[in-house]
């Protein structure tokens, strides 16, 4: 179908979504962030999150390092040929998280009670992926195969995605929902010097950069244009699960998922950001 048909379809879906499913989305987020444990496998049923129809969500043997779950890899078969896209978000959250309680304000802002983190980093990414897939299924539009990876240990130097078996992945491009408004400097590898008793003449820091002409970038820009979003591109010095995709030959982008003041008790998100994130995921699937 044409871009105009896709755009009109999503406008109709959004109207239905806002009218019928809006409360479901915000309430799901509040329940999910208020759940007692930190992993998606045991928490999703408590939060009212169920796998999308026809989706094969199964727990893969992940990198166990003292937690109570592994990475979760999901595949949803599609009707169209072509390389699938993989969407990724991480399940772990930072301290303080125990006893967290989420508050939904009338203006659509969601925050914690003030004594814990909210967990929008990265629960908002998980929900946007799940609801984005649901938008596509509800639209009835044919789509390519969809792959999803929910990782463990991202906050502990991407431990989960670092040891994941990427032979399971057939996607050639990835979208990682884990970008906040600012981040800290992170170096992946450092090389320099020849001996411990000699001052090195130089130090080489290797960085990863997704080319502007790559398909992941152009598809993102196209999806934003169809939806009327003013999406922009920016560099980031932070580490994320996208680093692991890059090491395994999968190009990708880290997308904003509507989290603010991450890693603090002032963390918050908004219902509107969750909607837009889900719509963006859905549009990327249909490209």
Spans of features found by a protein language model:
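A non-catalytic alpha/beta surface segment that caps or lines the substrate-entry region
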Residues: 43-81
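Short coil/turn connectors at secondary-structure junctions
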Residues: 68-69, 80-85, 98-100, 106-107, ...
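Short acidic, glycine/serine/threonine-rich loops at helix termini
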Residues: 98-100, 158-163, 200
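N-terminal hydrophobic or amphipathic helices/low-complexity stretches enriched
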Residues: 5, 10-45
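Short pre-catalytic strand/loop immediately N-terminal to key active-site residues, enriched for Gly-Thr
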Residues: 111-120, 231-234, 265
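Metal-dependent amide/peptide-bond hydrolase catalytic core
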Residues: 28, 180-287
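Acidic/histidine-rich catalytic neighborhood of metal-dependent amide-processing enzymes
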Residues: 118-189, 208
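Catalytic-core environment of secreted peptidases
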Residues: 75-119
């Amino acid at each position: 179908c044409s871009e105009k048909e896709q755009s009109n379809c999503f406008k109709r879906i959004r109207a239905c979504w806002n009218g019928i499913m809006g409360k479901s989305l915000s309430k799901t987020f509040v329940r999910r962030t208020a759940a007692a444990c930190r992993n998606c496998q045991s928490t999703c049923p408590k939060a009212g999150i169920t796998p999308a129809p026809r989706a094969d969500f199964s727990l893969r043997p992940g990198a166990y390092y003292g937690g109570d779950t592994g990475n979760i890899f999901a595949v949803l078969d599609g009707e169209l040929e072509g390389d699938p896209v993989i969407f990724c978000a991480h399940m772990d959250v930072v301290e303080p998280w125990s006893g967290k309680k989420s508050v939904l304000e009338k203006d659509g802002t969601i925050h914690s009670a003030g004594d814990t983190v909210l967990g929008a980093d990265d629960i908002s990414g998980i929900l946007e992926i799940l609801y984005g897939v649901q938008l596509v299924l509800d639209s009835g539009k044919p789509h390519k195969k969809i792959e999803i990876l929910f990782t463990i240990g991202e906050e502990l130097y991407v431990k989960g995605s670092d040891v994941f078996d990427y032979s399971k992945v057939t996607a050639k491009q990835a979208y990682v929902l884990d970008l906040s408004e600012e981040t800290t400097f992170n170096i992946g590898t450092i090389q320099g010097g020849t001996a411990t008793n000699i001052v090195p003449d130089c130090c080489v820091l290797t960085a990863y950069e997704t080319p502007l002409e790559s398909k992941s970038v152009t598809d993102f820009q196209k999806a934003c244009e169809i939806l009327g979003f003013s999406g922009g591109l920016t560099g980031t010095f932070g580490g994320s699960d996208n680093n692991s995709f890059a090491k395994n030959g999968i190009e990708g982008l880290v997308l904003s998922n509507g989290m603010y003041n991450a890693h603090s008790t002032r963390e918050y998100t908004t219902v509107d950001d969750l909607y837009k994130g889900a719509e963006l995921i859905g549009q990327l699937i249909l490209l």
